[in-house]
């Protein structure tokens, strides 16, 4: 029914549409953002329908088709969160967050990709709560997990999430044994639209995910850093102060 997912057509159609609307709205950026949010919500309705239909008719659709649909859905989420991230302070609800619940939600969201790629998903939490915004923290961790899945090794892939307390901080580490990041690229991974050199031939990327979550972490008062050795591992480290609050 759906045929192949025409990613290039969707991408260029969206860019053309954004350019047209940007010219139309001119400097009224709030109207433009509102248009983008409405457009995205309308697009997500048929995508959700496609995902559901694929799940209910797995014999008709191969795994790669469903994977591409989920990837498209994630990219659209990325656009939505990028639009919202410019003035997220109005949307923050800082509370004590249960990390177990957050990670459970993320693992369920990515369950199909984890299973289809034979990725071992480990969670060992020494500390189970942090102060943050639940919705935005889920987005941040989900983006990191998506990167781990995209840049995995072909065999014996592992994603491991651990947490520990260190003086006045809670440290959450997300480790994978994927293709890693070249040393020369590590300083630029949070730059807008930057993609690592050893990942370009493996999978297409907007280069916006880490840029967005870095900005979000700054506003939430969290610290984020990355350690990596090419062809060995990548570790993303999130640090939460016990009294973290977001920054205006």
Where are these regions (language model features)?
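Short conserved segment of the HATPase_c
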Residues: 181-193
């Amino acid at each position: 029914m759906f045929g192949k997912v025409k990613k290039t057509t969707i991408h260029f159609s969206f860019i053309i549409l954004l350019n047209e609307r940007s010219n139309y709205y001119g400097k009224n950026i709030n109207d433009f953002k509102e248009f983008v949010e409405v457009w995205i919500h309308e697009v997500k309705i048929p995508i959700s329908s496609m995902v559901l239909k694929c799940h209910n008719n797995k014999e008709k659709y191969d795994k790669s088709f469903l994977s591409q649909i989920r990837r498209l859905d994630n990219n659209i989420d990325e656009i939505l969160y990028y639009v919202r991230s410019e003035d997220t302070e109005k949307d923050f609800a800082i509370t004590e967050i249960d990390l177990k619940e957050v990670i459970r939600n993320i693992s369920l969201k990515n369950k199909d990709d984890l299973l289809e790629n034979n990725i071992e998903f480990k969670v060992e939490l020494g500390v189970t709560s942090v102060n943050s915004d639940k919705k935005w923290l889920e987005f941040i961790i989900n983006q990191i997990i998506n990167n781990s899945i995209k840049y995995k090794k072909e065999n014996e892939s592992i994603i491991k999430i651990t947490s520990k307390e260190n003086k006045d901080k809670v440290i959450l580490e997300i480790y994978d044994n994927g293709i890693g990041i070249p040393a020369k690229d590590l300083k630029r991974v949070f730059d807008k639209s930057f993609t690592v050199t050893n990942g370009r031939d493996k999978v297409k990327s907007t280069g916006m995910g880490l840029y967005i979550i870095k900005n979000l972490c700054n506003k939430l008062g969290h610290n984020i850093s990355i350690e990596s050795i090419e062809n060995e591992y990548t570790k993303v480290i999130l640090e939460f102060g016990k009294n973290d609050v977001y920054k205006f």
